Amino acid sequence: MEVKRAGTAGFCMGVSLALHKLEMAIEANGSGGSALRRICTYGPIIHNPQVLASYEARGVVCLKSVDGARAGDTVLIRAHGVPMQAEATLRESGAEIIDATCPRVKKAQLAIANSTASGSSLLLFGDADH
């Protein structure tokens, strides 16, 4: 049997950026008994069960609803983005919001919002390389 290894491996730029932002939030917050704030993600930060389990073990809370955000929390918006209304509700909660949305996803979200606001119909196709 021939085994071929992919030329590239690992996380895409957007996921790497989201994980970096989460690490920075954890580092800024302290750890263990000295943690200052609750660190949360709204939904899973990325789609990787092993990574999610490792952050949960470090005390990161995965919110399943925007209603779970509290004033004083630090809440990261996941790499794959959230609907604009969910982001607005999170910001109204009094939590510190860190937008970890992939820049490519955010660009698409803004294009969609601008197109639909002007009454245009929108057909969206994905990036074949992502």
PLM feature segments, named:
Residues 1-130:
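The feature marks the mature, well-folded catalytic cores of soluble enzymes
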